[in-house]
Amino acid sequence: MIQRIILLLALSFSLAAAAQPEEVKKMHENAKAFMRTGDFDNAIIVLTRAVQKDSKNLELQKDLVMSYYFKRDYAKALEGAKELIDRDDADVVCFQIAGNVYKALEEVKDCDKMYKKALKKFPKSGPLYSEYGELLWAAKDMQAIRQWEEGIKNDPGYSGNYYNAALYYFYTKDKVWSLIYGEIFVNMESLSERGASMKGMLLQGYKEKLFADADIMKGEEKNKSEFAKAFLQGIGKQSTLTNNGISTETLTMIRTRFILDWYENNALKFPYKLFDFQRQLLQEGMFNAYNQWLFGASENLAAYDNWTKAHAEEYEAFSKFQKSRIFKMPAGQYYQN
């Protein structure tokens, strides 16, 4: 989360730099250099003087608070964070910074109030929903999932809420959303460490949750989501393929037949980007490689390495395709209700 804020600060700094007086701009650049090397004392010295020259500069104030935060001077950081979020021009990053400071001080109640204020101002901010949910989850408040679901609904292009929601559902009796959200996240963060760990949880979810009972609809009588029921019914039609156990190969067959059935019976009622993507891979002859990438290494790393060598051309084609596009969920495809 801190790395994401640093990236956002860097981007916002580049946009604001042109509007700064030349002297202040130079001071800000020097301060950023100190921050990058971990010399937060010097960063604070320079930023404090720069703020005196340009007291309305939001980017300077954000970096000053972050420098206090990284120095672990949380009292000063909190003082600055409160000033940041009280500004009329406070942006999402201001509230993210404040959230970090409150969490460091373990001031849960004040942090809770701050996130509520933030989401009232930015009701479409995925990062704020994600981080508010993380605060609640750390406090063992099961209402955390409501924040992550709201984040998915209001900002479907942000990956963090899919990650948190998938982890939450993996630890419940849910059979659907842990797999759906987990696979969406893996495609949004295909190269991250979190993405790699999520792939292992997906394979485990198919084995231990989805196909744990011979009757895949068992326990789903009270499921209010028509989308979830349609998903389970579609998967259930292929359950005989699990008679010899679950493997990457059997999952590929199950998921192939599921996609064909989905587009015959449910796609018009429930358009869904993840399934569109799977269908595209199927049509272009890359679905087998995709499933190997998704499940193979978690099932058996040596076997997966052998597969990539034996199917080098197929694997290379998928890898190039994967690196050439960015996967994002669009608005209007939220089916939890």
Task: Identify the residue ranges that each predicted region occupies.
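Alpha-helical segment of the N-proximal tetratricopeptide repeat
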Residues: E22-K56, D63-M66, F70-D73
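Canonical tetratricopeptide repeat
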Residues: D63-M66, Q96-I97, E131, N164, ...
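Register position in tetratricopeptide repeats
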Residues: R36-T37, F70-K71, A104-L105, W137-A139, ...
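TPR alpha-solenoid repeat register
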Residues: L60, C94, L128, N161, ...
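Eukaryotic alpha-helical solenoid repeat scaffolds
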Residues: G157-N337
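Short coil turns that delineate tetratricopeptide repeat
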Residues: S55, D89, P123, P156, ...
